[in-house]
């Protein structure tokens, strides 16, 4: 892709928050270049907030450049203080090492099917662990002005909180990230670092250190921090983060998350997260606004993102579950799909046995009293495993795979019961 077209597309998508000299950057990327983004191991999985920078690496790779994914085995031992309200809890070396391996595997498994050339994977512990503390302070620390560092907004906010402040450990984080850029420039000729807009200060420090150590000019580009139209952080639900690991967030719940995206956000997220052209997204928005009824943008966003993260099989499974809950044809679900619902798709209670339906409705919270439960049954408001239910008793042989009952009240109230295995 033409360099100008690449950066024009990023701008039209709203993916450029801040950048060093844009004209210089466009000129530089007329030839194949290397860029990187860092991911600190703060958990054993990435979440959807990490998808935009990962997808950004793919956008550059599709244009003929080489992306590097840096896993912060060293920086993850400290934690980035940028715009954090309080000091991070430190994790053990064993925990961080396990998370480093998990993230490296996850990024490779996630991104490789979408790339003709795989991302280069690096771990900053590989070079940081070989530097002695005296050498680091002498050779790296001397290039940093404390006066300048404490003027950063992220540091000033912490210093303004007398109950929190900032430790020397976290204050030094910027030096480590800056050295990463200089190291990758030296070993991989890396010319650009990308990251969230909260990383701008660290990126600028890395640009300056690289110039001082290597005598080369490098660049930075930040992505907007993803928020919803109401200003709240995107990617969180009442149940917590939306993870990319299917064992932490099932493909069904992942699909539902995107499907429930607000109308005020969906077209912006299509620009950020998908590879639909800006023209296609604009046409979709115009079509949705012209027709009466539910817009199709959420469905397209959910399909694109679930396919990207969980593959076609994961998407089809999520769609089967959604359709089965809507139609009541729950016997069409396989055991793995029922386990997705058990994991995080429906409120699930585990019971030793089930025979009394009134008790079942009370245990699942679908009725608040025995009288109410009987009324729901008499009025035909209850379905069990898709069948309208009037009886007061229930045989275990009716359980799906001898384990599961899915109980429905009305159109939208669902609960799940799993029978304890003897």
Swiss-Prot record:
Single GO BP term: tyrosyl-tRNA aminoacylation
Residues annotated for ATP binding in this entry: 236
Location of the S4 RNA-binding domain: 355-419
Source organism superkingdom: Bacteria
Principal location class: cytoplasm
EC number: 6.1.1.1
Binding site for L-tyrosine: 36, 173, 177
Motif 'HIGH' region, chain ranges: 41-50
Residue span of motif 'KMSKS' region: 233-237
Gene Ontology terms: cellular component: cytosol
Subcellular location: Cytoplasm
Catalysed reactions listed for this entry: tRNA(Tyr) + L-tyrosine + ATP = L-tyrosyl-tRNA(Tyr) + AMP + diphosphate + H(+)
Keywords: Aminoacyl-tRNA synthetase, ATP-binding, Cytoplasm, Ligase, Nucleotide-binding, Protein biosynthesis, RNA-binding
EC class name: ligase
Subunit note: Homodimer.
Family membership noted in the UniProt record: Belongs to the class-I aminoacyl-tRNA synthetase family. TyrS type 1 subfamily.
Biological function: Catalyzes the attachment of tyrosine to tRNA(Tyr) in a two-step reaction: tyrosine is first activated by ATP to form Tyr-AMP and then transferred to the acceptor end of tRNA(Tyr).
Protein name (Swiss-Prot/TrEMBL): Tyrosine--tRNA ligase 1
Lineage: Bacteria, Pseudomonadati, Pseudomonadota, Gammaproteobacteria, Vibrionales
Gene this chain is encoded by: tyrS1
């Amino acid at each position: 892709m033409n360099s100008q077209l690449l950066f024009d597309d990023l701008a039209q998508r709203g993916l450029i928050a801040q950048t060093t000299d844009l004209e210089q950057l466009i000129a530089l990327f007329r030839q194949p270049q290397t860029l990187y983004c860092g991911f600190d191991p703060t958990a054993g999985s990435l979440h959807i907030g990490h998808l935009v920078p990962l997808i950004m690496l793919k956008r550059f790779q599709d244009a003929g450049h080489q992306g590097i994914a840096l896993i912060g085995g060293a920086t993850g031992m400290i934690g980035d203080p940028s715009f954090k309200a309080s000091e991070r809890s430190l994790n053990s070396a064993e925990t961080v090492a396990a998370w480093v391996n998990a993230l490296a595997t996850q990024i490779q498994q996630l991104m490789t099917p979408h790339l003709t050339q795989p991302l280069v994977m690096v771990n900053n512990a590989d070079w940081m662990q070989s530097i002695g503390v005296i050498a680091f302070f002498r050779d790296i620390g001397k290039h940093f002005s404390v006066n300048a560092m404490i003027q950063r907004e992220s540091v000033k906010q912490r210093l303004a909180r007398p109950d929190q402040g900032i430790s020397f450990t976290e204050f030094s984080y910027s030096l480590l990230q800056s050295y990463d850029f200089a190291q990758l420039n030296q070993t991989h000729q890396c010319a650009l670092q990308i990251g969230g807009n909260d990383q701008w200060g660290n990126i600028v420090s890395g640009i300056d250190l690289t110039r001082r150590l290597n005598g080369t000019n490098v660049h930075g580009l930040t992505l907007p921090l993803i928020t919803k139209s109401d200003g709240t952080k995107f990617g969180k639900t009442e149940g917590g983060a939306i993870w990319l690991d299917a064992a932490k967030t099932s493909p069904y719940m992942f699909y539902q998350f995107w499907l429930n995206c607000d109308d005020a956000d969906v077209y912006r997220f299509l620009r950020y997260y998908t590879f639909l052209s800006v023209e296609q997204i604009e046409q979709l928005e115009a079509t949705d606004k012209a027709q009466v009824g539910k817009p199709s943008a959420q469905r397209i966003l959910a399909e694109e993102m679930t396919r990207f993260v969980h593959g076609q099989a994961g998407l089809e499974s999520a769609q089967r579950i959604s359709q089965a809950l809507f139609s009541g044809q729950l016997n069409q679900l396989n055991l793995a799909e029922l386990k997705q619902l058990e994991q995080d798709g429906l409120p699930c209670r585990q019971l030793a046995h089930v025979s009394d339906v009134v008790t079942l409705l009370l245990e699942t919270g679908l009725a608040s009293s025995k009288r109410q439960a009987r009324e729901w049954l008499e009025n035909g408001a209850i379905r069990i495993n898709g069948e309208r239910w009037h009886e007061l008793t229930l045989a275990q042989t009716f359980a799906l795979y001898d384990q599961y009952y899915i109980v429905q009240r009305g159109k939208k109230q669902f609960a799940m019961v799993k029978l304890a295995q003897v």
